[in-house]
Amino acid sequence: SNLETETGVRVIAIRRAGDWLTDPDAETVLRGGDVALLRGSELGVTGVYEKLSGERYEPPEPPAESSADLERAMDSVVLMKDVSELAVDLAYGAVLFDDDGLAEEVLDLEAEVDALQSRFEAWTLRAAAEVDDPVSLRGLVHLAAATEVISDAALEISEGVLRGLDSHPVIREAVLESDEIIARYAVGEGSPLAGRTLGDVAVKTQTGMRVIAVRRGDESRAPTGKQTGWVVSPGPETKLDAGDVLIAKGTRTGAERMVELTA
């Protein structure tokens, strides 16, 4: 069965007898003894975890001591993590496919992380005055700093593309052998996607492409409380409008269908 379609949970990797299967697809068969890494909502993960392991899923306990500022700081770190992960994905895509557009998105994402880092620092300093043990926030600070380093590294990866440097022949050969691509698409005024959700149009079913991020053409439509014009890991309920930019992964054939759908 299609696990992601039915549950909203994606298996992002499988560890099997000391080896790793990264980015498994609908054809991948799970075996006894496999260790699957899952990504999805807590509700979805709970059901899939119990189905795979036969054991009850126990979500981690939230910290007993919290405040509004600490909640904002933690939300910022989570968003920084999501944005930096996306930046790394796009940076490799920019180099592999010599795609200026993807490299430009990495530049935008790196700036987003820098802005989030500044907000995170302000909220963490405020939170430190409200908790009994400010030293307990050290791990959060280290995580945010590491995430910012990752986004900087993503920009370094894509800088060659931004400067117009040619890809190495080995990279070009790797691209020819790979069936999966990553690309960006602007939603046009006449696109069937404009004014509708990803689920309404069944983008993945129609094209085989998975939309991994949306950059809002109008940043005032950013998700409430997210402080960014990006929607990372959008779901079926994510509404699109003309001017939005989609980042999607899939096959070359699917990419051609995506061009038609967004035009």
Residue ranges: model-predicted function:
Residues 85, 94, 101, 179-201, ...:
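Surface-exposed interaction/gating patches
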Residues 2, 7-9, 20-23, 28-32, ...:
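Haloarchaeal acidic low-complexity proteome signature biased toward cell-envelope/secretome components but also
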Residues 1-50, 194-253, 260:
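Cytosolic Rossmann-like ligand/nucleotide-binding regulatory domains
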